[in-house]
């Protein structure tokens, strides 16, 4: 039996000043970054002081915001004088954020030792989960400034939408691992390290990495471990903040099976972690543009094709009818996909966002997307063509 989902009222969520963090999450390539920017713009138009933290945005999105070069610090987006709020935007610079953490939690001498370490410069920021960990760290920094009354977060692109929640723990697990503890062995030089219990393994690593790189890795681990308690404590504190009232997770999904499957996983995980879920943005849908049934459109097109009169008007009418029928088939497929999601998640509110016929390349286009996201009557069934 088909379940009609509740409508996600994003306008009310953005206008509610008790909400301080909105996290846009979901699989890669579903429109999270553009959605985050549109929500941030709308919140500023509601009178709020907003910063949107983006992850690797397309160049045209930066241009849409009126900023040529997004950086690791918030930059104010120029808005019309009548807009009562403020919008600031920034892009996560993973390396600079890592550098800031090292300097914050280490003394000057130790911090410089870490920053100059060759292993840190070439490998550290490539560790699995580092980007998500740094996104969490940057969110914590923004929250601690108490400068913004709303922070909108675009989570890192990933093949697995759960990485944003799992990465801080995974990076922590790596730093608790046997290899990490081996490199950390107190009072040992690299020569003694290689002749210890794990000598064969370390020799193999030395062959692959080179002895100097292995020495740099050991020095990096030993320097960083003294400060990692601060890293872990900060990440745990930020993670806890995401569970508090005032945070809203918005799961974004395209109208595709894999993206909706990821969305379902994320909804389940948020429930398990007791994290506040606002609802689902069902993005880039193709609703029917008129009430003409698909079968009648096909019949009418075939009738026109059969006419002996071969005019441009007849050919154009037949082509329009076929386009309508094709769009109708797409809409039916999207409705089936949404029905599966709502059947498995009947309590999750949904807003449907039709695919725009233009690129989001300026503030007006971003505002048009914000209109779709915050229009209360824009329920998922209508947006998907139901």
Swiss-Prot record:
InterPro entries named among the record's database cross-references: Anion-transp_ATPase-like_dom (IPR025723), ATPase_ArsA/GET3 (IPR016300), P-loop_NTPase (IPR027417)
GO molecular function: ATP binding; ATP hydrolysis activity
Thylakoid keyword on record: no
Regulation: The ATPase activity of the BagAB complex is not stimulated by antimonite, an arsenite substitute, suggesting that BagAB is not a transporter for this family of elements.
Gene3D superfamilies: P-loop containing nucleotide triphosphate hydrolases
Deletion consequences: Deletion of both bagA and bagB does not reveal any conspicuous growth defects in vitro. The double mutant is fully virulent in the tuberculosis mouse model. The double deletion mutant is not hypersusceptible to arsenite in culture medium, but it is significantly more susceptible to nitric oxide (NO) and it exhibits a glycerol-dependent recovery defect following mouse infection. The double mutant is hypersusceptible to extracellular methylglyoxal, suggesting that the glycerol-dependent toxicity is due to heightened sensitivity to methylglyoxal generation.
Enzyme class: hydrolase
Signal sequence range: none
Binding site for ATP: 29-34, 283, 354, 356, 359-360
Entry's EC annotation: 3.6.1.-
Keywords from the UniProt entry: ATP-binding, Hydrolase, Nucleotide-binding
UniProt family annotation: Belongs to the arsA ATPase family. BagA/BagB subfamily.
Domain notes per entry: Binds nucleotides asymmetrically. The two ATPase domains of BagAB are spatially separated by the large central cavity and they do not physically interact with each other.
Its job: Component of the heterodimeric BagAB ATPase complex, whose two subunits are actively involved in ATP hydrolysis. The ATPase activity is required to mediate resistance against nitric oxide (NO) and elevated levels of glycerol.
Quaternary structure (record): Forms a heterodimer composed of BagA and BagB. Interacts with Rv1509.
Protein name: ATPase BagB
Organism (species): Mycobacterium tuberculosis (strain ATCC 25618 / H37Rv)
